[in-house]
Swiss-Prot record:
The lineage of its organism: Eukaryota, Viridiplantae, Streptophyta, Embryophyta, Tracheophyta. The gene is LCR29. It comes from Arabidopsis thaliana (Mouse-ear cress). Keywords: Antimicrobial, Disulfide bond, Fungicide, Plant defense, Secreted, Signal. This is Putative defensin-like protein 131. One of its GO terms (cellular component) is extracellular region. It is found in: Secreted.
Length: 83
């Protein structure tokens, strides 16, 4: 009889730990969903076409050369994507 009680407590503990893990995971996903993230791509120069393609391939986002008024050698690729 004591063995059954120990097994029941053990299984309930495991069950609640697994449920708690999924609740925490859901909270983390909910926090980052819908937010906009940004990142810079390293490189020697920025070509708008290549920048946009690289950002789309890497993060499924869009890329622009920043600052827009600089020469291609002084600009860098700035990516915007959904977190």
């Amino acid at each position: 009889m004591a063995k059954n009680r120990v097994l029941t407590i053990f299984y309930c503990t495991i069950y609640y730990c697994i449920c708690f893990k999924y609740v925490l995971l859901g909270m983390v996903v909910e926090k980052t969903q819908g937010h906009i993230c940004h990142d810079y791509l390293e490189g020697d120069h920025c070509d708008p076409k290549d920048c946009n393609l690289d950002c789309r391939d890497k993060w499924k986002g869009t890329g622009t050369c920043e600052p827009p008024t600089g020469t291609p050698l002084t600009r860098t690729c700035y990516c915007t994507y959904d977190c």
